[in-house]
Amino acid sequence: MPSTSEIILSANTHPGDSTTETVTGSNFKGDGYYGRSDGIHTVQYDYAGLTGSITIQATLATTPADADWFDVDTITVANLTEVKYANFTGNFVYIRAKLVYTDGTVNSVRLNH
């Protein structure tokens, strides 16, 4: 089956007032949704001047409530600009990104599976 690549969190720029902002992305289908057996997922984080954390959350629920989500990968940075990759494995039904930050810009978070 061909791999899928999609942006799960698009551009977000902090207003620059040092407040803590939280952005939770939409639900995106993971390998478990499609019945794939390998469960391999890769995310690409692309950010500039970011101070904060980006967490990838997953769920096994087909109609998830807030309590159904758990963390599978987190990066925490202080005033950093880079493109970074991470891999994780699991037959997750849905995946989403959660951004908590006090400065900077997230250009995108891309999911490949």
Language model region names:
Residues 31-38, 70-113:
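Beta-sandwich interaction modules
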Residues 45, 49, 76:
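Polybasic, low-complexity nucleic-acid-binding and compaction segments
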Residues 1-37:
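Transition segment at domain starts
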Residues 39-43:
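Structural beta-strand segments of beta-rich domains
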Residues 44-46, 57, 98-100:
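Residue-level recognition of well-ordered beta-strand positions that form the cores
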Residues 48-53, 102-103:
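Short proline/glycine-enriched turn/loop motifs at strand-loop junctions of beta-rich domains
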Residues 51-71, 108-112:
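Short, surface-exposed beta-strand/strand-loop-strand elements in extracellular ectodomains
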